[in-house]
């Protein structure tokens, strides 16, 4: 277990200066990558899965079609995340939405369709990692659900 001592003496947040007395960051190693078995996760922040193009397709589909489209997008999101993290996925990923609910998310004056729910996938995702669109804004964070 490694620790990083922060050498920050002060923080300037929007013109307000705050003195930093002490701080540290803990390094934790997590499994990441293809798993032999299916692992259950749930979204703890809204998953922004749809772009403008696939939103038009999504709204025309029946419930089974919507679920199938979202499962394909979920696999694509995990593949994109892996590529960004320089991890090569060499096996076929399988994902299944167990339950989900869509709703409108408003962010900076824009509306998106967000999703809550749980899913299974044969991939190890560290807790609190985000998948999908707008992850840098905190969307799409997941945690493993222990069974």
Curated annotation (Swiss-Prot):
Superkingdom as given in the UniProt entry: Archaea
Protein family: To M.jannaschii MJ1086 N-terminal region.
Protein's name in the database: Uncharacterized protein MJ0978
Lineage: Archaea, Methanobacteriati, Methanobacteriota, Methanomada group, Methanococci
């Amino acid at each position: 277990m490694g620790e990083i001592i922060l050498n920050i003496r002060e923080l300037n947040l929007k013109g307000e200066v705050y003195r930093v007395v002490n701080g540290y960051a803990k390094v934790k190693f997590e499994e990441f990558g293809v798993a032999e078995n299916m692992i259950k996760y749930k979204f703890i922040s809204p998953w922004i899965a749809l772009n403008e193009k696939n939103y038009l397709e999504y709204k025309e589909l029946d419930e089974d079609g919507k679920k199938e489209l979202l499962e394909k997008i979920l696999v694509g999101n995990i593949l994109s995340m892996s590529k960004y993290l320089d991890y090569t996925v060499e096996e076929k990923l399988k994902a299944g939405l167990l339950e989900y609910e869509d709703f409108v998310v408003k962010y900076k004056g824009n509306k998106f369709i967000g999703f809550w729910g749980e899913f299974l996938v044969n991939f190890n995702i560290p807790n609190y990692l985000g998948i999908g669109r707008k992850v840098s804004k905190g969307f799409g964070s997941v945690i493993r659900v222990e069974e």
